């Protein structure tokens, strides 16, 4: 049973911070050291001061957790942050520009009871890295707070929740935010008991699919085991932003792979394994360009296994299609993923079980081509966007995909609501 509850959200005080657009930041794992420095320097109340970036200070990693904890406590004492007296759900409508068009995504924020994966209430789709989990554990333990929502997915096939959220959006937003990258956020506090009861009841029998935030979820699991004493403890709940699978603003973008620093013999062996599995046709990048190649891969991939290959020079590319006489279904459900086929049947054969650690991952096809041109990479593989229905089928069946198989977009902003892990929900 899923226990999705309203939480006593902790929010920035607009009387002090004034402009919420200067508060929000991307998820921590999308923030490199340069962006972190810029946000900290230019925006004294930005959420990055609390959430941090993907890599803590390598010279003194504990310092970042202590600084975040101290600042968080100061902001609470100074009323920069104020906790809602009553528990609420929160609704965010995130409007953004994409490919010359406008899209909107809805995210419903609240607290999900933290449970082990074997309970099958929260379903993961990838494995985690221990250092990244430890980083988030230390932040939770230092601050006793969760600064960003975990993005997860649910299915509302009967459109039960949809009219409830539509009714909320019929009211004036509690907050409207225009950010510097042409995004528009509307934010509502859901405070009426009828809506809160209906939302809680709706999710009781709905599995929750983790989209972004596996490391944060597993950090919450460990924090719970170390600190929880009662079922209603805030430590037992992790803040999530739940997005419906068919939300028109939800996108799964492709994640590509690149390899560099391998020997000529290994590269030749990779080519041999590819030739054993795929039929190849050349693609002239000097005529059509890498974006056209990516679009063709996406189109061809609707009905078959397709991989694009870049290299060894910047104008050379191929489209690979899995040979028709290969019975890929015997490999199991994960073989629906080209990333799995590439990793398990090609790269691991050549590079061993650590093949995934040797790859560079990017959703920027042109960037990979540039790195081929500069000889930073020797070969790159372009993949199609992972189909949402295939994702739901594989993950719902208890399988986990290879690392960096999914790139959910848009990324949810950090800073709208903070979940305090002290007290009860």
Regions found by a protein language model. Give the residues of each.
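Surface-exposed, charge/polar-rich loops and edge strands
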Residues: 1-425
